[in-house]
Amino acid sequence: MAKRTKKVGITGKYGVRYGSSLRRQVKKLEVQQHARYDCSFCGKKTVRRGAAGIWSCHSCKKTVAGGAYTVSTAAAATVRSTIRRLRDMVEA
């Protein structure tokens, strides 16, 4: 099948509505939310978004909570590193 859009991608469904800058922002989010991600349990690239914040691996059937548009958010990464640092301080 021929490629239909070059610039607009997934936001071509909105046509000329809503303005180009808003469609560009939506494109970034929609590409992230429809992408497949690596599973932290089985290592396969089969994690898909089920609903806002719910991510399921279709290989090992694990379900994890994450961000609305990506599996892991920047805030979650900060929390994980802080917990790891505090755990190391307690153990040392």
Swiss-Prot record:
One of its GO terms (cellular component) is ribonucleoprotein complex. A zinc finger (C4-type) spans 39-60. Gene3D superfamilies: 2.20.25.30. InterPro entries: Ribosomal_eL37/eL43, Ribosomal_eL43, Ribosomal_protein_eL43, Ribosomal_zn-bd. It holds the Pfam family Ribosomal_L37ae. The keyword Nucleus does not apply. The keyword Endoplasmic reticulum does not apply. GO terms for molecular function: structural constituent of ribosome; zinc ion binding. Keywords: Metal-binding, Ribonucleoprotein, Ribosomal protein, Zinc, Zinc-finger. GO terms for biological process: translation. Belongs to the eukaryotic ribosomal protein eL43 family. This is Large ribosomal subunit protein eL43. It comes from Candida glabrata (strain ATCC 2001 / BCRC 20586 / JCM 3761 / NBRC 0622 / NRRL Y-65 / CBS 138) (Yeast).
